[in-house]
Amino acid sequence: MKPNKKSKKRRVIQVFLLMICSMILFISYAAYDIWSSRFKTDEVDTDAAIVLGAASWNGKPSPVFRERINHAISLYNSGSIKKIIFTGGTKFEAEQEEARTAKAYALKHNVKDEDILIETQSRFTEDNLKNAQQVGIDNGLHTYTIVSDPLHMKRAMRIAKHIGMDAYASPTPTSAYKTLDTEIPFFFKELCSYIGYVTSLPIRSLKEIIK
């Protein structure tokens, strides 16, 4: 093999190894960031809490959703927030939307009806936040406390930042993901979702420029 061919092959291998190392570093940092910031709480009073949707069954919130709702109610009772925006639709027309389930639960726990806002169209985190932001704008709200599970917070706050929301983190102090059997799968799910979202941002920005 000629020297120049050897050097080209070496460069290709070096570039490939550099790409692999960069990917490993990026994934490792993302994993560390999600894990280390999971309990980061911003002690800031805001106009409203945005409760990210989760499953509801037969008009009752799932254990995961219930903990999110309870935390928002706690913030409301402490005076840290003035209103609560519940988010989430439903997969099936016959089922009650997640946001309506959450509202019914909050009303039973002495949250005033006029202090509850809902959006019932979203099914995913990004849409939860975008729709809630529009509800807030329509009701003259400006600052928000994002409420969700600890491992969900990093991605939620990254999305909130990208859409220009003045938002602060308040992860639930308790979670249905208590054991390694439930917490580890949820962690890796969030890691994949976070990486997917972050890596999609350059393409999203390019599309916005083209528009």
Where are the language model's segments positioned?
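Serine/threonine-rich low-complexity intrinsically disordered regions
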Residues: 4-7, 112, 202-203
